[in-house]
Amino acid sequence: MHNVHLPQNIINRLIMKRGKVEIFDSLDPAHTALVVIDMQNAFVAQGATLEVPVARDIVPNINELTAASRETGAAVVWVRITVAKSGPNAFLVYHQNFFSPDKAARHQAALAEGTESNALYAELDI
């Protein structure tokens, strides 16, 4: 999603620590899952309440990864944040302490169960 460049000194430290950059030499599809998080309309759709414009840029990559994962037999898991009206899934501490009241209300409404903004972005190959 973001253009990230690891400085060479960090890469060198990884190599010193484990002898290589990559953690795994290969992945066993039977024991592997691609987990896709926060690709809901609330974050991805143009003009959405919680829009992250660069999220749309990674949709083609996600679709390629999901196709490759399915082709090899790896699981594909889609994670949606859903905010309930009450109870532990209302994220009350989060909304009361990290947002102004109006921003909290917008966040809660955008991620409410059954809303279009809570649905996964339509251009994803689900």
Where is each model-derived feature located?
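Active-site acidic carboxylates
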Residues: 1-123
